[in-house]
Amino acid sequence: MTERELAEAIEVIPERLYWVALHTAPKNTLKSHYFSIDDELLYEPFFADFGPLSLSLTYRYCKLLEAKLNDAAVSEKRIIHYCGHDSKNRANAAYLICAYQVVVMGKLAEAAYEPFCGIYPPFLAFRDATCGICSYKCTIMDCLKGLEYGIQYRWFDYNCFDVDTCEFFEKVENGDMNWVAPGKFLAFAGPSATSTDNDGFPAFTPEDYVPLFKEAAIRLVVRLNRKQYDRQRFIDQGIKHVDLYFLDGSCPPNDIINKFFHICENEPGAIGVHCKAGLGRTGTLIGLYAMKHFRFPARAFIGWNRICRPGSILGPQQQYLCDMEVDMFQAGAVMGKIPHPFMAADLEKALALQVEKLSVRDGPNHGDQFEDVGQGERLCNAKRHATLRGVDVLSPNLQQHQSRNATPPQLGTFPIGASGRTDGGRGVVNRLSGNATNWKPQDPLSRQTSPSGGVANGGAKSLRGIFG
């Protein structure tokens, strides 16, 4: 890297950390140490989407960069994160180095991104996971603000995050589930009535989820898609179940919003929410709740949701959440700064008026009049096919490095920011007591029918242990 190229690099930490896009891979020098993650931390696309990189990959990057900055062997060198000029790689690389500043250095999103303001060419905005044209632009700043809010509400704690367990449960063969608001909302793919789906691919049944949900204090399941299993299979195992169906790929009608709020505000335990793929309808309703109860801005929530569960919130649902932001903030303000878990009749009426007002203002572009038929099934198929291809978000080299240095995931504490509370994440840390569920990773070609047996790395896997 020439002095001219260094002059064009973005200085993140004065005289120490830099970011730059280069046409060719540079060699280390006496003064500079270079590294790239373009071929190491990989986004797994559904269709034309390419980022942002997931929470687990964000965490791994932060650990990687932190180690380099603390490495005595390069303590006198400039650390330079370089990427190629591919627009997708540039966006993901810039997101990561900014995320490091938010997560590890404690900077606000605006301060972290400030060195990149005015960069040319501008960064490519992230898009949704639909097949068609995407008019909504999810920016790097949206994602950084999402991280900032997630940390503020203690939904993510860098010091106690269990990355191995997070990556385990987000795999299709291990349940396809992610915490969006840890301890309050878990998003997951719709359970199957049988242990294999129509294509013969291994699938999770209600009975597979039950022991995991019980261990994680998930006491209620909300189904948003058409019936594909008997809800009694959850109820008989002591987990409540509610149906709130609305059209695939659509935005929720007013009555669904009101029912969802009433149910969730009266449920002290954690809630598992799913549609077909657990991405669009699921993320949209959780987003409305987050705006109302946590004043989580819509654009930031979309960024956060996609970091937690890639592919979430699609098509018209994106702009819909933005249009609902003011109304949800107002609805939350009616309930007070610290929302009470039970809605009085007058508060329910006030919320209904807010939602109705928006519905009249927006006309036919929102609500349940739009349906993307088969969207959920397409998304599920994309994930299944990636699993069959053996796609992994870590490169082979990094997989070997992680396996050599990995320690077995352990149960511990996790932030109470959403443990049945609606106080914006304030509270003490709660220690999990109880037995972990041993869970064997699912072999796509060999179905494991019961949650028993040791995991690959010898540690017990716990949904509740992901965040500490």
Regions found by a protein language model. Give the residues of each.
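PTP/DSP superfamily signal
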Residues: 1-22, 28, 36, 48, ...
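A composition-driven signal for long, intrinsically disordered, charge-rich low-complexity tracts
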Residues: 38-40, 64, 224
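Conserved SAM/SAH-binding loop-helix junction
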Residues: 281
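Acidic/glycine-enriched edge-of-secondary-structure segments
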Residues: 25, 35-59, 186-198, 245
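Conserved G/P- and acidic residue-centered "switch" motifs that form tight phosphate/ATP-binding loops
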Residues: 278
